[in-house]
């Protein structure tokens, strides 16, 4: 009984704090959240240590703490960067949308073709170890990274048709990304939201010091 009274008193004395925690949890679950990127699969757009803001109502309004969609608010577009809980990969992933439902997509020696149209790739920079390309996908322009001297089965795939309710996604770091080439199409119900900005960034290779030049940086050109 004494423990129960102590608990009741504790709750009563901290009602404002508990309400704030509940509201913040609901906000992060259903409206917006952030995600620390641990890998380089989206380089150079996103690098290790970036903390990304995610708009969780970009495509659906979901019941907090569930995957139940209450209202469809939009649909992913070509070039969107999405965060999703991949059942196939058994982890949360962040990738760029390349193929929409109904699209016919193929890749030949790193060059993507969608519905018979080959994407424009303009060489921006070349070093001893890599190429950087500016890739144009509808209204989206983004930089992709291609490492040299790497033999990989990720460089090409035959024509595939994206099923209804699914998306084909790739990482911008094309030869260092486990994406639809590995795990297949992404079903819509796995989507958590659209990544929009770098909120904060720390340099893993320099004592985790802040990289202020990346703070509040948009992920889109």
Locations of the language-model features?
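Soluble "head" domains of membrane/secretory-pathway proteins
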Residues: 2-11, 26, 30-36, 41-221
């Amino acid at each position: 009984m004494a423990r129960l009274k102590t608990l009741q008193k504790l709750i009563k004395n901290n009602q404002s704090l508990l309400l704030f925690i509940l509201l913040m949890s609901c906000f992060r679950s259903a409206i917006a959240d952030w995600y620390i990127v641990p890998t380089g699969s989206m380089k150079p757009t996103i690098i290790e240590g970036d903390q990304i803001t995610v708009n969780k109502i970009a495509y659906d309004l979901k019941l907090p703490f569930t995957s139940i969609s209450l209202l469809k608010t939009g649909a992913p577009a070509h070039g969107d960067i999405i965060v999703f809980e991949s059942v196939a990969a058994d982890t949360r992933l962040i990738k760029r949308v390349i193929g929409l439902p109904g699209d016919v997509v193929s890749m030949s020696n790193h060059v993507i073709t969608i519905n018979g149209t080959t994407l424009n790739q303009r060489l921006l920079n070349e070093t001893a170890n890599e190429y950087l390309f500016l890739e144009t996908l509808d209204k989206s322009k983004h930089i992709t990274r291609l490492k040299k001297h790497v033999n990989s089965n990720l460089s090409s795939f035959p024509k595939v048709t994206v099923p209804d309710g699914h998306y084909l996604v790739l990482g911008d770091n094309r030869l260092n990304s486990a994406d639809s080439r590995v795990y297949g199409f992404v079903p819509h119900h796995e989507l958590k939201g659209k990544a929009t900005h770098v909120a904060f960034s720390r340099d893993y290779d320099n004592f985790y010091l802040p990289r202020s030049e990346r703070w509040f940086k948009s992920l889109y050109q």
